[in-house]
A protein has these predicted regions:
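Outer-membrane beta-barrel strand-turn architecture
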Residues: 19, 63-67, 116-119, 171-173, ...
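Short glycine/proline- and aromatic-enriched beta-strand/turn motifs that initiate or cap beta-hairpins
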Residues: 21-62, 120, 134, 143, ...
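Repeated loop/turn-to-beta-strand initiation elements of outer-membrane beta-barrel proteins
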Residues: 23, 68-72, 120, 173-179
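Glycine- and aromatic-enriched membrane insertion/assembly motifs of diderm outer-membrane
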Residues: 24, 40-95
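Flexible, solvent-exposed loop segments that connect beta-strands
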Residues: 34-49, 82-103, 135-157, 187-201
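Residues that define the transmembrane beta-barrel architecture of outer-membrane proteins
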Residues: 51-55, 102-108, 159-163, 202-206
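Outer-membrane beta-barrel "beta-signal"
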Residues: 173, 200-214
Length: 214
């Protein structure tokens, strides 16, 4: 029901006369992690993950009625997600492993935006949903210098979806500098060789991005 209301609002904005629209290039840095839960407390204590620094790059289309600060944004973004991992547990596996898991997604975000103009400077906030498709992935274990290419068993294994929100500043209606928090809702668990397996894993990304509008 909520998604229907979002699409209805976007359709209403598109049909509004005097629509002001811009196409832009978006680039940024991702600080990605995975939220994991384990069924055993000792495994949970021995396994933890930190942020993986990645990238995002793509196109965005922003539109709003000229007499209103409310509008929408849609994009096509290449986004690198994943996490670093550290496993040190003598009780469970008598081993130490460190490395990172990397997933490269093509994402389509759909956001409602509100912009407040203050002369040549503007501030904006947004929120919405996204859908992603994993193009490739790998797990690198640095302690053993091995790389495992991610194998996706089905189309659904490549999919990710969730919500995002953020805010930023805009200069001359051309340059936008902002931050975004993205939280996945789909369980993206996949096997990592010789490591304990979580019961659930979802993507979380904090990104800092720059947009140039034409």
């Amino acid at each position: 029901m909520k998604s229907k209301k979002v699409f209805f609002l976007i359709a209403l904005l598109i049909c509004t006369s005097g629509l002001y629209a811009q196409l832009g290039i978006k680039a940024g840095v991702n600080m990605a992690n995975e939220i994991k839960s384990f069924s055993q407390a000792d495994i949970d204590a021995g396994f933890y993950s930190n942020n993986l620094t990645g990238y995002q790059l793509g196109l965005v289309y922003q539109a709003m009625p000229k007499k209103s600060g409310l509008g929408f944004e849609i994009g096509a973004i290449l986004s690198q997600k994943g996490s670093t991992f550290h496993f040190d547990s003598i009780n469970v596996a008598n081993t130490l492993k460190e490395g990172y898991k990397e997933l490269n997604y093509l994402e389509v975000p759909l956001n409602i935006r509100y912009r407040l103009a203050l002369g040549f400077i503007g501030i904006y906030g947004f929120g919405g949903v996204y859908g992603g498709y994993a193009l490739s992935g790998k797990t690198v274990t640095e302690t053993t210098n091995t790389t495992e290419i991610e194998t996706f068993q089905s189309f659904s294994d490549r999919l990710d979806y969730g919500y995002n929100f953020g805010a930023g500043i805009e200069l001359f209606k051309k340059i936008q500098l902002g931050g975004t928090l993205s939280q996945g809702l789909k369980n993206t668990i996949s096997a990592i060789t010789n490591l304990p397996q979580p019961t659930t894993a979802t993507n979380r990304v904090l990104s800092v991005n720059l947009v140039y509008l034409f």
